[in-house]
């Protein structure tokens, strides 16, 4: 890998996808929910991270950062407010196409354990509620299963086609599903077997179709 590699931690992947999705479908981003007060998402140019979740106010010296800041902190800040909801100058698809993007699993969690897998994405759910507030928790579950189905949460290079497929799927969902209608219903209508609906577990977290 080149010296200027960018790495995307698995715990942050869906946040990045939803950030990009929000601009492509013209969603209006609202202020951070109260339970997300400490969420700050920034992009830096360093090799260590492309995306990192941490507490408000944390910046890496010299990095070009795009931040989510709690509205109260932004208002009370003596310095000029940071433009909210600004996406990195380098689009995610360009980052991936350059060959410099790689997923790094969070070593604190066992991604094969359902409980740990949920913890790995618990922070990301706050980003989901921010980006698409009218979609239910099932949207995160569907995306989570999609990622596991395509082995995205590995240290292998992320296949851009998989990411594009998920983004297209999300676009269709955002554009066609009315508020408060679970994404599960659309998946069930398409013939998918959802482990969390039908009970039991499916090996590898795979969504099964009637032909499987």
Swiss-Prot record:
<keyword id="KW-0614">Plasmid</keyword>
<dbReference type="GO" id="GO:0030541">
    <property type="term" value="P:plasmid partitioning"/>
</dbReference>
<protein>
    <recommendedName>
        <fullName>Trans-acting factor C</fullName>
    </recommendedName>
</protein>
<comment type="function">
    <text>Plasmid partition require REP1, REP2, and a cis-acting DNA sequence (known as STB).</text>
</comment>
<keyword id="KW-0616">Plasmid partition</keyword>
